[in-house]
Amino acid sequence: MKTLAVAAIAGLGLSACVSMNSGSMNQNDASKSNQAVTQFPIETALVNIYAKASDETLYSTVEGIAVEVNFETIPKGTVMFNGQRVQNSEVVATTKILSEIIDKSVGVNYYTLDPLVFRGFTSDDEYSIATQMASIPKMADVGSSSTYLTENVYSDSGKRSLINRYTQTWTLASASSNSAWLCINSSTNLLLADDPDGTVSECYKINQQGDILDSKIDNSYPSDEGMMTINFNRG
């Protein structure tokens, strides 16, 4: 789901816990650790991103000005959404420029678990219904990708005015011998010939357990000077 990434260049939900092994490692274990990992748990990583409590800040410099976005993900339990019982998580995105708060946005992601299926997203002026076109794999090979979701965004729950339609694609690329970048790429608004918001790519560095090790957001959008990209990452 697109969360608040376009509105606030945020909306990531990261698991704060990273499991680490300690102690001695025998020779067989050491040999195994040097082998490149080629498969990663996509579903577990996405559950950590969207359904687990978290609090994190990403940073960027836009036209020489320091910008930071803090986002907090708060699981809220079970609710009714679009006629079905689902799980939901609230996302609060707070944007600061030069350390001064300029915007605070609240959105809610809706999904079901076991298996993970995305259902939609709401904010003050959006009511979004997701149609998942492909299942989320338990495991995937590095280099894999899938366009898995189409989302229709309405101005309110009455669904009388369709204001946005976009697709989402996940991709998995190698980051190191034992980690990978899982990116969620949102298309432009398919209802517009030229979308001023452009595209958003939310990327998460994951390990073999699906823990979130790092994150970043890239927002590419058209301007008078051509395509521009704003990059947000951990400080």
State the predicted function of each range.
Residues 98-131:
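An acidic-aromatic
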Residues 18-43, 126-149:
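N-terminal trafficking/processing presequences and adjacent post-cleavage segments
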Residues 1-7:
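Sec-dependent signal peptide recognition
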Residues 20-101, 155-235:
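Acidic, serine/threonine-rich low-complexity disordered tracts
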